Every structure is written in structure tokens, then in C-alpha cells.
């Protein structure tokens, strides 16, 4: 480390230590480390634990080894409130045990992609980090039900838990978790493919504060599970059911009758959902802001009519691969309150019946920011150009296949490659 010969710089004389610490608190990690090399006085100030309450090592993930985490934990101690180790694949259980012992006031911990960690890390967190509120274990594939039992015993203040792609988790783990962590507000279970309806029943019984639930690709879930959730979690605002291919309109009915605060619904690839279900949903869930209905192949313009009438706050809508949607449905959407005032994103990829007429209707959507039109075969470059003349700020994503080369001139058919000619 390179220090100056004197610590008697003017700034150190004029400003009290408390003010210098306050200034340093606004600096990022890299800048703090640079300041630490200026002088001995600044080294002490820059590495003061109070400046290291929030640490994000994502930009250095390939270089972060366990000893780095251990050193940070010793430096920060009880000051550290938030740490992100997202993508730090070199960090394992031993380092995180040291971290947990030293940083007992941690509230927000991101271990997304830390594939070396196992249940041992969760035991350490349970034992030492009782103030933990936010924990991300995405893709920590060695985590099992034992981790959830430990967390439920020692981290009862937990409000957010991401277990996406932790595919060893089963209903037994979820039951243990929710019995202890009854204040959960967000639970993300994407790709937890072993979960069944019974897991959702446990959530219904214990997580009445839940506002966000992600069940993407939990392919064993049926209407029974969704109905249970809706009956117990009336505060639900965001629900992802994408890839839950067993679901029918019964799930939408339960949502409509029990979850009036719903703002986000993702139901991509739920191919059994129909206009009837979305009609009941729209008539009861007036707070809807974002909907992903990609590959809901049975819905028609009727769904868009109901959304136009009853969902004035709608901002983002995906209808990709909904091949029964026509210009008529887009007309209703664009003429509605949400079309005029709120709509920002509309995805219409592979809507084969949509034509340039829809683009004319969408000129009414003055707030539109992004429009997806891949493989809309009846939409033309000219139509897009006319719309962008009216909405110059909108980003239009489309693809037009290269022009097919003209047929060969008469008499030149059945041409052979040079090798064949030689042979």
C-alpha cells in the first residue's frame, strides 16, 4: 500500500473525522479502496466499518474467493446490513460461516449462483443471523429441505426468500419454512419441480402476509393448489404461474374472487386458460398492471375487451403466440383508458391475424414505449414506419425475412455443382 509522507493534509486539518466519514459513506467499494491508499489517516477512514454497510461484489465475482468474504466480514462486523455475492462461485460454506459469525446484523444477503454452498451455510445463518429479512438462494442446487428447517428456526424475521431452481426442495421443506417464517411477503419458487399442491396448502395456512409468489415451471401444481393459495393469501399482488400447464379457468376464478389487489399475473404457456376465466378475473381485479399471457392459445379478442373495460391501470401486456387475437381486439385495447394513459409495453409476436390496422389503432397509445412484432406476417415495414411517424419514441422490434431470390431463368434448371459435372 502506498502512503504519503505526511498525514497533515489541509483537508484532514479543516474537516473533523465525523464529517470525513460522512463523505466517505457515499463512495463505492472501488473508490474507498483507492482512498485507502492515499495516506494512513485516509486508510483508517476508508476502511472504517461504518462505510461498509452495503457491499456488492457482483462486478468482481470471478475474483472473489472465500478469504475476501472473511476479510470483509472481519472489517465490517456488526455494521454490515447488506451483502451481495451474486455469481461468486468461489465462495463456500466455510467462508460464509465466518461471515455469519462476524456480521450478525445482516438483513439482506444475496447468494444467487453461489453453487458451492450447501445446507451448512443455512445452518450458520440460522444460528447467527436472526435479523435476516431478505435471502436469495437462487440456483444454490445443493440446498435441501434441511436448510429450510434451519432457516425457520433461526431467521423468523425473514420477509423475502428466493429458492428458484433449488430443485431438491419438496413440500416437507416448505411446511417447515412457513411454520417458522410467518411474516414472509415474497416467496420465489421458480423451477422447484418437486412441489405439489400440498406445499401450497402449507403456504395458505401460515403466510397470510404474502404479496408475491412465483411458481414458474412448478409443473405438478394444479387448480387445487392455486385455489388454496387464493383462499389464504388475500393480499397477493404478484403471482407467476407460467409453465404450470395443468391449470384451467378454475385458477383464474379463484384469483378473481379472492385476490382483488392483484397487480401482476404471469400465466405464459398455460394453454388451457380461456376467455371465460380472464373475463371473471378482469371484472374483479381492477388493479392489474402487468399480464403475461404468452401462449394462452385459446384466448380471443373477448379477453382484450374485458381488460379494456375493467383494468384501466394496465401497463404491460404480452399476447405473443395468441394466434386468435385480431385487429378488433387491439382496437378495443388502444381505445380504452389504459390504452390512452397507461400502456407502455405490448408484445404481439406470432399473432398471425394482426395487420397494419392494429398499428394505426396503437397510435392512440401515446405512452407506448415498446412494441414486439416478431413473425407478425401481415405487418409491413410501411405500417411500422407510419406508426413511428406518430409515435417517434416507441421501440418496435420486428423481423422481416430476406426477400426470396427470383426463380432460375428458363433453361438453367437442374444445374449441377462442379464436382458432379466433373464426375
From Swiss-Prot:
Signal peptide residue numbers: none
PANTHER family assigned to the protein according to its UniProt record, in alphabetical order: F-BOX_LRR-REPEAT PROTEIN 2, MITOCHONDRIAL ATP SYNTHASE COUPLING FACTOR B
UniProt source species: Mus musculus
Post-translational modification: Phosphorylated by GSK-beta (GSK3B), promoting recognition by FBXO3, leading to its ubiquitination by the SCF(FBXO3) complex. Ubiquitinated at Lys-201 by the SCF(FBXO3) complex in response to lipopolysaccharide (LPS), leading to its degradation by the proteasome.
Pfam families: F-box-like, LRR_6
Domain F-box: 9-55
Domain commentary: The CAAX motif is a signal for the geranylgeranylation of FBXL2 and is required for its association with cell membranes and the recruitment of substrates to the active SCF(FBXL2) complex.
Residue positions of covalent lipid attachment, annotated as S-geranylgeranyl cysteine: 420
InterPro entries (UniProt xref): F-box_dom (IPR001810), F-box_LRR-repeat (IPR050648), Leu-rich_rpt (IPR001611), Leu-rich_rpt_Cys-con_subtyp (IPR006553), LRR_dom_sf (IPR032675)
GO MF annotations, alphabetized: calmodulin binding; phosphatidylinositol 3-kinase regulatory subunit binding; protein phosphatase binding; ubiquitin-like ligase-substrate adaptor activity
Protein transport recorded as keyword: no
CAAX motif, short sequence motif: residues: 420-423
GO BP: any one term: ubiquitin-dependent protein catabolic process
Name of the protein: F-box/LRR-repeat protein 2
Amino acid at each position: 500500500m502506498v502512503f504519503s509522507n505526511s498525514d497533515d493534509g489541509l483537508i484532514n486539518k479543516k474537516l473533523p473525522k465525523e464529517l470525513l466519514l460522512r463523505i466517505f459513506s457515499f463512495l463505492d467499494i472501488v473508490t474507498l479502496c483507492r482512498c485507502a491508499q492515499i495516506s494512513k489517516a485516509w486508510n483508517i477512514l476508508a476502511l472504517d466499518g461504518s462505510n461498509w454497510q452495503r457491499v456488492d461484489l457482483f462486478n468482481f465475482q470471478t475474483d472473489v474467493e472465500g478469504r475476501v468474504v472473511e476479510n470483509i466480514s472481519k472489517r465490517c462486523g456488526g455494521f454490515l446490513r447488506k451483502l451481495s455475492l451474486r455469481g461468486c462461485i468461489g465462495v463456500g460454506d466455510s467462508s460464509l460461516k465466518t461471515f455469519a459469525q462476524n456480521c450478525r446484523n445482516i438483513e439482506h444477503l444475496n447468494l444467487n449462483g453461489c453453487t458451492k454452498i450447501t445446507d451448512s451455510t443455512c445452518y450458520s445463518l440460522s444460528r447467527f443471523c436472526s435479523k435476516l429479512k431478505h435471502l436469495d438462494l437462487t440456483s444454490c442446487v445443493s440446498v435441501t429441505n434441511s436448510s429450510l428447517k434451519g432457516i425457520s428456526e433461526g431467521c423468523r424475521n425473514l420477509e423475502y426468500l428466493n429458492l428458484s431452481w433449488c430443485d431438491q426442495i419438496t413440500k416437507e421443506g416448505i411446511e417447515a419454512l412457513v411454520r417458522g417464517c410467518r411474516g414472509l411477503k415474497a416467496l420465489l419458487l421458480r423451477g422447484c419441480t418437486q412441489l405439489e399442491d400440498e406445499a401450497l396448502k402449507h403456504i395458505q395456512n401460515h403466510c397470510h402476509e404474502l404479496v408475491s409468489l412465483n411458481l414458474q415451471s412448478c409443473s405438478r401444481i394444479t387448480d387445487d393448489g392455486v385455489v388454496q393459495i387464493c383462499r389464504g393469501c388475500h393480499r397477493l399482488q404478484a403471482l407467476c404461474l407460467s409453465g404450470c400447464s395443468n391449470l384451467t379457468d378454475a385458477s383464474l376464478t379463484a384469483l378473481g374472487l379472492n385476490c382483488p389487489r392483484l397487480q401482476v399475473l404471469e400465466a405464459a404457456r398455460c394453454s388451457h386458460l380461456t376467455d371465460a376465466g380472464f373475463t371473471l378475473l378482469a371484472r374483479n381485479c381492477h388493479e392489474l398492471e402487468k399480464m403475461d399471457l404468452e401462449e394462452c392459445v385459446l384466448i380471443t379478442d373477448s379477453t382484450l375487451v374485458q381488460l379494456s373495460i375493467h383494468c384501466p391501470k394496465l401497463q404491460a401486456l404480452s399476447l405473443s403466440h395468441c394466434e386468435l387475437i385480431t385487429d378488433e381486439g387491439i382496437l378495443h385495447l388502444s381505445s380504452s383508458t389504459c390504452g390512452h394513459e397507461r400502456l407502455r409495453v405490448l408484445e404481439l409476436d406470432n399473432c398471425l391475424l394482426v395487420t397494419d390496422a392494429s398499428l394505426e389503432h396503437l397510435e392512440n397509445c401515446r405512452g407506448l414505449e415498446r412494441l414486439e412484432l416478431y413473425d407478425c406476417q401481415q405487418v409491413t415495414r410501411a405500417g411500422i414506419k407510419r406508426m413511428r411517424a406518430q409515435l417517434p419514441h416507441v421501440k418496435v422490434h420486428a423481423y422481416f425475412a430476406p426477400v426470396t431470390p427470383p426463380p432460375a431463368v428458363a433453361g438453367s434448371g437442374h444445374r449441377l455443382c462442379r464436382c458432379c459435372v466433373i464426375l
